[in-house]
């Protein structure tokens, strides 16, 4: 019987997601056993700086990917939104399970909705994508950076000077928080999600045929098609989770993939948004990126990167 070694970050959410995947794979094929190996990533080590200032891609996956290439682990469970658009040679996304809730969740002290927050309210987030879209909706808000896991952020909301914080609905759901804790689920029209938000990525070596066969049984085709379109868009835009870029795809009534992409200035003053539909995920992502680049999206990303590097 083969023991499959699974790499995971040490956070409660990461371990919970990894255990969920292992349970599902064990149900599909009980002849395998699994062993979790916890790995600390660069993104986990740097908690006193915003992610946008840390820079680079793969802040939460690079060390885990290296362990896979070294054969210390066989596979890894990641949050898809942490995955860079391009993978290291030799590694593949072996499986994309069914997606969780894609929305961002607003949690406020008095259970107020976004439009009900007082003028100048302090909102905590670690994401330029979220802050840019919030500022477009409510330019009067004060954005204050916040890092740490879900429990830490909820504690900071209670004890520090935040009026509200924004978290991914998927993370709250996976950690067993009830929907009652959420003041408002922000619609994709208000706050377009990050590429891959709510989805998991199970990564492994491309030559591990046995494992790839097991993982193929756990892939959700709807999620796979839509997420691949989003990731193709991200790749063409040369984006990362450190810049204000968003992408969300669904299947429309004609059974086509419908992808909306968004790039914003950090202050939310400039937002470029485009929707493209079709049947081929790669082609749709590429087309959406091209249409947005023609409207100045890449120049906007370059400006954000330049501004961040000079701070």
From Swiss-Prot:
Monomer. It catalyses: 4 porphobilinogen + H2O = hydroxymethylbilane + 4 NH4(+). The lineage of its organism: Bacteria, Bacillati, Bacillota, Bacilli, Bacillales. The keyword Transferase applies. PROSITE patterns: PORPHOBILINOGEN_DEAM. Gene3D superfamilies: Periplasmic binding protein-like II (3.40.190.10), Porphobilinogen deaminase, C-terminal domain (3.30.160.40). It is an enzyme of class 2 (transferase). GO terms for molecular function: hydroxymethylbilane synthase activity. GO terms for cellular component: cytoplasm. Its EC number is 2.5.1.61. Its cofactor is dipyrromethane. The porphobilinogen subunits are added to the dipyrromethane group. Pathway: Porphyrin-containing compound metabolism; protoporphyrin-IX biosynthesis; coproporphyrinogen-III from 5-aminolevulinate: step 2/4. This is Porphobilinogen deaminase. HAMAP family: Porphobil_deam (MF_00260). CDD domains: PBP2_EcHMBS_like. GO terms for biological process: protoporphyrinogen IX biosynthetic process. Binds 1 dipyrromethane group covalently. Tetrapolymerization of the monopyrrole PBG into the hydroxymethylbilane pre-uroporphyrinogen in several discrete steps. Keywords: Porphyrin biosynthesis, Transferase. NCBIfam families: hemC. Pfam families: Porphobil_deam, Porphobil_deamC. The modification S-(dipyrrolylmethanemethyl)cysteine is found at residue 241. InterPro entries: HemC, Porphobilin_deaminase_cofac_BS, Porphobilin_deaminase_N, Porphobilinogen_deaminase_C, Porphobilinogen_deaminase_C_sf. Belongs to the HMBS family.
